[in-house]
Amino acid sequence: MAVELVHPEVNLNVTRQVDGPLIRKLSVSNFRNYSKVSLEPSQQMVVLLGNNGAGKTNLLEAISMLSPGRGLRRAQLTQLNRAKIDTTDEDNIIEAQRQWAVSVKVESNGFQTTIGTGCETTAADGKSAKRLVKINGEIVKSQ
């Protein structure tokens, strides 16, 4: 697949081949500053723009949680839960009580796969948690 990069300030047109897997849909809930967001990029290349603190790195961290390990910031699972809660909105209070989750629909060689991960609290105090991983809706056991 070819991607055309256009930079308006430099009048630069570049065509590049994209051979790797493409994220067709990203869904995030209760992750850092996001209560719920779903993105479906229409292009094969995406640039995230925004002010400091807008959540650009949080989206990248959410994607990084789909690989083995603790993500790009190496945070504890319980630290990834949404931090700010609007206590005037009952739906937000209920949603904030749930743990974080990240899901992507990935396309590679014409095939689509859904990969998801999230956190499940394992103690009443909410401080202990385990990570769950699903591929195409099936829970994957750790190796």
What do these predicted ranges mean?
Residues 2-65, 86:
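Pre-Walker A-like glycine/lysine-rich segment at the N-terminus of P-loop NTPase domains
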